[in-house]
Amino acid sequence: MSKITTTHVRDNVKELLKYSNETKKRNFLETVELQVGLKNYDPQRDKRFSGTLKLPVCPRPNMSVCIFGDAFDVDRAKSCGVDAMSVDDLKKLNKNKKLIKKLAKKYNAFIASEVLIKQVPRLLGPQLSKAGKFPTPVSHNDDLYSKVTDVRSTIKFQLKKVLCLAVAVGNVEMDEDTLVNQILMSVNFLVSLLKKNWQNVGSLVIKSTMGPAFRLY
């Protein structure tokens, strides 16, 4: 049973979009984030959940993705306009923690050719997994462009040491219906991951990158 109504979410989305598109329009595409505060949860004792959800519409079309590819995938990446690194490029990092950390910071997500995925931990150590950015595999039969779109449309809820999390659920160029739908999907999915469902939800807020926060719960 959901504790928030579609009408309430819609009213807040209207306000948020009005602020970002009329009151204070920025010269870049603002992302809309769902910020969650949890309660009655002990990250030390309770199971730290993690789950991914593919949204119908990509929340961050400009999200940066890098491909670790064999020759075939590096070529495909170039034609899709996506950054790519070959095995030699990865070897050049020489397991240098600083450089790998920098790489993990530079991109929001990674994709790797199936043939390379097993080599990633050996070449890069545990840094990408620690950052929650272990690459998604792609095979030569997959359409690379669709795979990149899938990765850009997938959001991840992962509880770490603190009781708050934030995920991108949309952007301010989306229409009201799309944004409302993406928010409700994300909230329901998150609640399903929690041990006591709604009893673990302390607060739900939506916010555009530079805009004020609107409280849903």
UniProtKB/Swiss-Prot annotation:
One of its GO terms (biological process) is ribosome biogenesis. InterPro entries: eL8/uL1-like, Ribosomal_uL1, Ribosomal_uL1-like, Ribosomal_uL1/biogenesis, Ribosomal_uL1_3-a/b-sand, Ribosomal_uL1_CS. The keyword Ribosomal protein applies. GO terms for molecular function: RNA binding; structural constituent of ribosome. PROSITE patterns: RIBOSOMAL_L1. Keywords: Ribonucleoprotein, Ribosomal protein. GO terms for cellular component: cytosolic large ribosomal subunit. Pfam families: Ribosomal_L1. The keyword Ribonucleoprotein applies. Belongs to the universal ribosomal protein uL1 family. This is Large ribosomal subunit protein uL1. It comes from Eremothecium gossypii (strain ATCC 10895 / CBS 109.51 / FGSC 9923 / NRRL Y-1056).
